[in-house]
Amino acid sequence: MTRLLASLLFGLGLLSSLPAFAAERTITLAVQNMDCAECPFVVKKSLQAVPGVGRVAVSYKDKTATVTYDDSEADLGALTGATTNAGYPSAPKS
């Protein structure tokens, strides 16, 4: 009985030290300055360079970028920073 209790407590201790599970998130960004046919490719490439980004779809017509990312590796600031650094400021689409 003592061994069982000790094993159970040890197992619970291991579980409590594991990091929280990451979540896959999708966000649509409104992107400024997209005024030529090459712009969506530059925006997409800048977002794909952010660690944790999985999928990126950019719409020239709608001036948006839809990004799926792992929230344990990337966040909104990293995404908007990447597009801004490429010359295309962005913000969450409302």
PLM features per residue range, with description:
Residues 3, 29, 84-85:
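N-terminal compositionally biased, intrinsically disordered segments and leader/signal-like regions
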Residues 27-74, 78:
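N-terminal targeting signals for Sec/Tat export/insertion, comprising classic cleavable signal peptides
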